[in-house]
């Protein structure tokens, strides 16, 4: 064996057990029994042994609002590793007037040899010409089996219903999964412009211009269009009861409706956008944070198996230099917030509070995203033959989240001041220790591109 992990409590989505495990050549080769000698033995007494976290919603080196986000693959993936995440699926964004192949080549240049953990891509389709829709057919051969479209941001990303239908139809034929940002873009734009015309330019009006019904209407429409062409569909970042009801209604009538929520929708509210000294701009993301009552609704849905995962939607817009561009007009504030490092710790608080079980935690942050996005059982579980992506978790360790302790390129944390109990201590990527007792010890060449399998239609 290369490594033996002994005395830990193994937690998977299927159960909890006490067993030692052996690792060789990057794979888990034995669980329990006599393991024999190893080059290194790690004592995991008092710790949970989790599969590495999988974050299927990140925007690492993104360009939007005429500016470049702060993180690189090097900084964002080190942050992810230190938070217990060993795989991300990042959004590879097509440039208008360019092919999808050019987008993939661009992302390969940014991520290749510069990622601390394993990574894959979803494709964001910004310019859905007929030739681009046809080009979607070749993506699964590259291991890219999901793509995203937007029902919001007219003039930037927004597509019409016919294009969404074409995209869904193409996905069925190619074994891919369409991910949809569901907001009624015209309604949001109308309210945004109306508020600004009335002199209402503070960050809070970002939330007020995108009320829950703006999200719910588009969610219902996207699900109906998927139903029309009998396609699976994945609704990203569900935030509120109104949208959740649409997802559940669709499921009840047999639509293959999948959905995620994100960490910030479990903890932040629209009142955070009213923080003084323009601090509210830190919490401008889309869809916006909702009411506190929605936290309970979302946690209940997580417990009841409605959601596939909790993602971070990590997007690294600095407070100084990015967000402050919108001091006089909330429409100029780049939308998005960091969270790839904090994700597992924040979701784990749901275990401490009795909102979800320990096995549900693993299901939501690792196993289910691996299954949905074509990585299981290579990723997302602890089993013989799986990649040795492992997190040793101290359930008793406590910390207060502060940006000074994070590893990204940001100047704030969305969860600044939150006290958490339960933190990752040691992280292995394919059998290599990349975080050792809280310290990053890996290399930027550790991560590899992950070719994902087709979605099971």
UniProtKB/Swiss-Prot annotation:
Sample GO molecular function, one term: metal ion binding
GO CC list: cytosol
UniProt entry tagged with the keyword Phosphoprotein: yes
Residues that, per the record, bind Zn(2+) 1: 57, 59, 148, 313
Binding site for substrate: 153, 286, 335
Presence of keyword Iron: no
Keywords: Hydrolase, Metal-binding, Phosphoprotein, Zinc
Major enzyme class: hydrolase
UniProt modified residues of type N6-carboxylysine: 148
Entry-annotated residues carrying Phosphoserine: 69
Cofactor note: Binds 2 Zn(2+) ions per subunit.
Free-text description of this protein's post-translational modifications in UniProt: Carboxylation allows a single lysine to coordinate two zinc ions.
Cofactor(s) in the UniProt record: Zn(2+)
Enzyme Commission code: 3.5.2.-
Entries under NCBIfam families matching the protein: D-hydantoinase (TIGR02033)
Function: Catalyzes the stereospecific hydrolysis of the cyclic amide bond of D-hydantoin derivatives.
Family: Belongs to the metallo-dependent hydrolases superfamily. Hydantoinase/dihydropyrimidinase family.
Name the UniProt record assigns to this protein: D-hydantoinase
